[in-house]
Amino acid sequence: IMKYEVESVADRMGEVLAHDFKQLPAVRDDGERTVLLGLAREEGLSAILEALEGEGILVASSVPAPLAIYGAWELVSTKADLDSPDDDLVLIADLGRSSLDVALVLNNRLVFARSTTFGGDQFTEALAQDLGAEMGQAEVVKKQRGGVTEGAKGVDERTIRPLRTAAGQLLGMLESSIRVGGSQAGVKLPGVTRLWFSGGGMRLKGLPRYLS
C-alpha cells in the first residue's frame, strides 16, 4: 500500500522521491492504526547530503522536519500526566524561513505531523508590499522593529497591520492542521491544552502571544 502511495505522488510530481513510513502508536477510534508517510524530493535531499559531506559531515540518516521537532519536544518537554482524567493535546509548530512544520501530540503520543510551504518570508513579503520596500529592507525592518502587538516596546506601529495579516494566515493554517490532523488520525481531538513553538520565525515580537 505504501509503495502505491509513493508511486502515485511521484507520478503526479514527476520526480523521484525518497520515502519512509512508520505506524503511529495512537489507536484510531475505529480500532485501526494510522501510518505516517514521509516524502522528500530525492534530488534536493541528495544535494544537501553531498554539501554536508563536502564539509566533512557524514549523515547516517535523514528525518522529516515535522518528526524532528516532535523528537526535540519529546526530549526536553514536560510530559502529560497519564493518570489525569483530562486529555492533553500539544500543538508543536516550527516556523522557518519558508516552511511550517506541525506536529500534534495527544497524551504523549504523536497523532499527526506535516510540513507546509509557509514561513518568515511571507511576513517579509507582506511588510514589503505595505511599505513599498525591497525584500531585503523589509527583512531588516521586520527583525529590528517589526511586531504584531500594539504598544510593544521597540515595535514600529507601521509594521503591525501587515505583519498581523500574515500572522492571521499562520493562525488559520495551524487551526486547519488541527482539523485535518483529527480527521486523518481517526481520533476525536480535544481542545489544544499546550503550545510549543520553535524556529526563527516565531521570534517576531508578539507572535507567540498572538497565536496563543
Named regions from a protein language model:
Residues 73-88, 173-182:
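Phosphate-interacting basic helix/loop segments used at nucleotide- and nucleic-acid interfaces
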Residues 150-212:
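Helical "lid/coupling" subdomains associated with nucleotide-phosphate turnover
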Residues 1-80, 194:
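Active-site neighborhood for divalent-cation/phosphate handling
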